Amino acid sequence: MSQLATHASPTAVLDRLALVSTVRGAPSLAERLADLDRWVKSDLKDFEAELDALPRGARVVHQAAHHLLDLRGKHLRPLCVALASRFGEGFTPRARSLAVAAELVHSATLLHDDVVDLAERRRGQPTASVVYGNAASIFAGDWLLISALRRIRTSGVEGVLDRMLTVIDEMIVAESVQLERRGKISGAREDYFAIIEGKTAALFRWAMIAGARSADLPVASEAALERFGFHLGVAFQAVDDELDYKDNTGKDPLADLREGKVTFPLVVAIERDPALRPRLEELLAHETVEADQLAPIAQAVRASGALQATRALAEDHVQRALNALDELPAGAPRDALVTVALASLERQS
C-alpha cells in the first residue's frame, strides 16, 4: 500500500510551527532562513564550484546542459545531502560529489520533461529545447545522467549507486504511468500518488540517504532521514501543483492542465464536482488546448476549494517530515531541516 494512503490533520503543521516558535524558542521563519543561509553558505559555495566545473565546450550537448544549470534552481536536493551529512562527518568531498550528482539527475529529468511536455519556459527563461532543439536537450539530459552515475560510483559511498539505479527506475515507471494516464480521469487519485512517489519523492529520499551514508550515520538515523525526504518530496510536489494555478512563478501558468496531467487540484475538484468530469474529458480529448478553453476549468477548480485541499496535503506531509526528525538528535542540522520543511510551504516558484 502507498505510504500516502492515510493523512493526519491538515492543520497539524501550523500547530507544529507554533510549537517550534514557543516551546523551543525558535525565531520567525524569516530569521530561521537567514540562519540557515549563513550556516550552509560555505557548503553551497563548494557545491556550486564543483557543479560549475562540469565540462563546457562547443558541443551542443554541453551548451544545452549548461543552459539549464546556469539558470540556478533552488538546489534543494543538494541541500538535503549537505544537511544529512551534517549529522555525522559533515559535508566532505564525497558528500559534495553526491550532492552534485543529485542536482545532475534532477536537471536531467527537467531537460527530458521539457521535451515531452513541449514546455517553452523554465525558471523564467526559454527552455533548452526551445534554444537548442529537442534532440540536443535529450542528449544533454543523458549526458548529465551519466555524469551523475559516474560521480556516485567514484564517491566510494556504499550502496548509494544501487539506490540511485532504483530511483531512476522508479522515475521512469512514474513517467510512463503519467504518459499512459494523460487526460484520463478514472483512478486519478491512486495514479496521482503513484506518480509523485516515483517522480518527486524518490530523489528526495535518495538525497537524504546519500548524505547519511556519506557521513556513516547509524541505520536508524538514515531511516529517519529517508522518511523525512519522502514526505518533503510529497509536500514539494503538492505545492508545485498549487502553483500551476498561479501567475508569476517562472513557469507557464496552467501548464500541467494544458498538458493533460491530472494533478491533485484536479483530483479533488472532480471528486467534489462530478459535473466537471465530462467537461474535462471533452477538453483533454483534443491534442491542443487554447488558453480560453482552460480558463473555465481553472475557475471551477478554484471554486471547488481544491487549492486549499492541495495546501492541506502539503501541510500534512510537512508535519510527517517534522515527525521523522524527532528521532534524530537535537542540534543545528535538525533545526536546519525543520526550516527547509517549513519553507517548502512558502515557496512561490
Segments (PLM) and residue ranges:
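Alpha-helical scaffolds flanking conserved acidic
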Residues: 91-102, 134, 221-232, 336
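A short glycine-threonine-serine/GTX helix/turn-capping micro-motif
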Residues: 188-199, 308
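Conserved N-terminal diphosphate/IPP-binding helix and adjacent helical/loop segment
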Residues: 1-107, 111, 115-130, 166, ...
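C-terminal charged capping/lid subdomain of soluble metabolic enzymes
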Residues: 3, 76, 297-349
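A non-catalytic, amphipathic alpha-helix used as a structural packing/dimerization or gating element
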Residues: 42, 46, 163-166, 198, ...
